[in-house]
Amino acid sequence: VPLDLPDAILAHSDGGHVLLVDCLTLWATNLMLGERDAEAATDALCMAIRRFDGHLILVANEVGLGIVPDNALARAFRDVAGRMNQRVAAVAGEVMFIAAGLPLRLK
């Protein structure tokens, strides 16, 4: 997953593409390890999602369903990934949660 994911998405926005991004959680990891501003990057991602002309499929992991992590880095990651997922879901036309191969339509 490239760090400049929004630009990569928009590079394929021509109405004829189906684009699969797997996975946003790995992108969030790379942003944190690269000491990038995850909030600003998520802003750019949401703008790219709104501007994309085609069929865009985004995959992310849900990392907030377990116990509270015992270390600061893991808690920060959980929070960054959770905020990113919420913001992406807000601009997405459809949101599915998949567990054990079973889809649950959230939006």
Per-segment meaning from a language model:
Residues 1-44:
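Conserved inter-motif catalytic segment of the P-loop NTP-binding fold
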